[in-house]
Amino acid sequence: EVAARFPTQIDGFRALVAAVRSFDDVSLDAPALSAREGVRRHVNDPLLEDMLFCPLMYYGSATERDMDFGQFVIMFKALFLEGFARPLEGVRVILRTLLAKYRAAGGERRMKCGVRRIEARGGRVAALILDDGTEVTARQVISSIGAPETERLITGDVPNGQGTTPAGNLSFVETISVLNREPAELGWGGDTIVFFNDSERFDYSRPQEDVDTRSGVICIPNNFEYGAGRRLPEGLVRVTCLARHDRWTAMPEE
């Protein structure tokens, strides 16, 4: 399709694919590289560039207008070289597999026990104090609540300069439509995931309004291949767009 629609770019695109395949995307020591700069070494058509970045940014970039080249490579391989798939039960199947591996390695999962604070001793994290007062010690702690939120929980011997990470600019809003029929009956039977952009240039940044509907992702889970006789119990259509977090949090609950 690239050769047909962008004939002057096909050689550069093939060079980009070769660069992606040869890049060590699991190296922890790789320097930070701009994906925009990396792509422009091979592709100089702005439309093709935007078409490459729209899916990869929506599925794998936490920064505005650009992403790290290593993350670009991971997402490029996953989306363009490997393709999309979805278990019938969704991400729960993957989570159960990961949990089984974790438990087999000696891990323990605790649910419904929030973290009250993170204790730092000697300049590093030493323990978690849970909401019920229980102390859990650890040599390493991985937090998934966000950098600013994590830093607000840290108490004790904190090195100078810690606790100053600003919140990111990107946020999203997602609508899920539950239908009493298959989306294919409404004419939506040919696609599983559609990435769209109707602007002259793809603008992956915090919108000025509540929601930026110029670009986004449309996902129709019913259209994935689940095997003979297997189907979702109801029709689903998910639409994801960029949103402005501060405007949403300022809205009344009702």
Report each predicted region and the residues it spans:
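FAD-dependent oxidoreductase catalytic-site/capping-region signature
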Residues: N223-E254
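Helical element adjacent to the flavin cofactor pocket in flavoenzyme catalytic cores
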Residues: V73-I129
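Mid-domain catalytic core of redox enzymes
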Residues: R116-R231
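Glycine- and acidic
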Residues: C54, A78-R86, H245-E254
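Redox-cofactor-proximal catalytic regions of oxidoreductases
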Residues: E1-A18, Y59-E89, R230-V239
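General beta-strand structural signal in soluble alpha/beta enzymes
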Residues: D50-M51, M111, S143
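Glycine-rich phosphate/pyrophosphate-binding beta-alpha loops
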Residues: L56-S61, F172-E174, H245
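Rossmann-like flavin
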Residues: V2-M67
